[in-house]
Amino acid sequence: MYEDVPIYVKDFLSYMQNIKNRSKATIHEYYYDLRNALRFLKLYKLDKIKLDKINSEMLNETDIANLDIEFIKSITLQDLYEYLNYLSNNCSDRATTRSRKVAALKSFFNYLTFKQKLLDKNPTVELETPKLSKRLPKYLTLDESLALLHSIDGKFQKRDFCIITLFLNCGLRLSELVSINMQDIKDNVLTVIGKGDKERSIYLNKACQDAIAAYIAVRPKDGLKDRDALFISERGTRIGRRTVEVMVKKYIEEAGLDPKKYSPLKLRHT
């Protein structure tokens, strides 16, 4: 499978499927999006074909299986903008589709730069996502929610997974989440103090119960400056709002989603 793309693309697809646990549908989208982008870039950069001369038939006939990593290293931000310009002018892609293709490129180049260490410079760092209509929904789909959860890793994986699980399932405000104390959870019910100091009770489904149990099992016990707080920062204090905002943005980007579109506020409406 995927024999018509270079080995580093195959490796990326394998990484996204086996390590990041992306769905088969998402892997196929990555494959088609990256294959199309590399075919265009070969025609445009190597074959020196003018933008207005490139058509779908030429793309379909272009062989990229032997493109070496040196070609990838030569790709610039401007080359990628030319590709987006081509999509906008020659394809029927809507902004949402182009946005998905940008996300695929960002994930691919992030992988080559930070995981494989094959690139010294990532040309997608400043690549902007096509602006989406304000009428588009601002909540995550099921696949996007799963992608976000699968992106969580690192030293605080259990804590961060628990935080995002609660955001996705409980409709918590950021202020409510950081204010949760250990004693606020009893018999699978979470009690929070919301706007206007109004107390409300939230039933915790199994996903939340499992995430909380997994986090509490590794939650720091020694040297805490706030023993009541459920979520503890690296310094042993109650986790702050800004820390959560930065953390959520980080995982949104790693999931290939648009951080300008999603935030803790948007997660609570999912």
Ranges and model annotations:
Residues 1-270:
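Conserved catalytic core of the tyrosine transesterase superfamily
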